[in-house]
């Protein structure tokens, strides 16, 4: 930065010196005084700016290259600190089943372990569980014979004598005898009428006398 500032100051001094020199020459020619001074000053300023820009650009490129090179050097690690990647691990193949057990036994064992871990059961176990639950709800279970016996016992409890037709007929006859003590006996009924007639007529109806 200090070098660039010094160069700029030198360029300005040169420009000013040239401007004053042209000013002195311009006094001899008063007609072209204004135009000559401003034109020359403008040209000198443009040349000075071009030179300063070129010098500044060259210094910047040199400095940038040096900085960039320094960054590269700082980023590069020495070989002593470099660590090699670890060797690849040997991948061991998983054992599908032991040599002592057959594949079918291993699959069965695997299925049992999976059900035990996940809490899943087979359909057969589920059906057995549902049957046990039904038996607990209904102690004897849905037995048709036992159900028929139970209904017959309930009917007997409702009707103690049971629906026996023969016994029912005997019961009706006994009820009739209780209502009529002598019972509806035709022969006995005829004897009763003859006795009543004898009582009505003491001598009785003698056919010969009649």
Swiss-Prot record:
Q: Where is this region: Disordered?
A: 116-210
Q: Where mainly found?
A: secreted
| Cellular compartments annotated | Secreted; Host cytoplasm; Host extracellular space; Secreted, Extracellular space, Apoplast
Enumerate the glycosylated residues. Answer: 32
Q: Which GO terms describe its biological process?
A: cell differentiation
Which GO-annotated molecular functions does the record name? Answer: receptor serine/threonine kinase binding
4 X approximate repeat A: region residues: 127-198
- Bias regions of kind Basic and acidic residues — which residues? 125-137, 144-200
Q: Where are the A- repeats?
A: 127-135, 148-156, 169-177, 190-198
Asked whether the UniProt record includes Lipid metabolism among its keywords, one would answer no
Q: What does this protein do?
A: Mimics host plant CLE extracellular signal peptides that regulate cell fate. May play a role in the differentiation or division of feeding cells (syncytia) induced in plant roots during infection.
Q: Which family does it belong to?
A: Belongs to the CLV3/ESR signal peptide family.
Q: What is this protein called?
A: CLAVATA3/ESR (CLE)-related protein 4A-3
């Amino acid at each position: 930065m200090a070098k660039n500032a010094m160069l700029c100051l030198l360029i300005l001094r040169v420009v000013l010196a040239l401007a004053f020199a042209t000013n002195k020459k311009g006094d001899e020619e008063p007609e072209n005084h204004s135009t000559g001074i401003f034109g020359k000053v403008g040209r000198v300023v443009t040349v000075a700016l071009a030179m300063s820009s070129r010098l500044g650009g060259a210094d910047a490129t040199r400095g940038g290259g040096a900085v960039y090179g320094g960054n590269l050097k700082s980023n590069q690690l020495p070989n002593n600190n470099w660590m090699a990647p670890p060797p690849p691990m040997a991948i061991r193949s998983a054992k599908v089943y032991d040599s002592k057990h057959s594949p079918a036994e291993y699959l069965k064992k695997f299925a049992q372990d999976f059900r035990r871990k996940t809490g899943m059961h087979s359909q057969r176990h589920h059906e057995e569980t549902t049957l046990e639950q039904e038996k607990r709800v209904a102690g004897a279970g849905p037995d048709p014979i036992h159900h028929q016996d139970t209904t017959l016992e309930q009917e007997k409890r409702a009707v103690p004598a049971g629906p026996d037709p023969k016994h029912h007929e005997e019961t009706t006859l006994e009820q009739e005898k209780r209502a009529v003590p002598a019972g509806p006996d035709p022969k006995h009924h005829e004897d009763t009428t003859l006795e009543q007639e004898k009582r009505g007529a003491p001598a009785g109806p003698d056919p010969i006398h009649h």
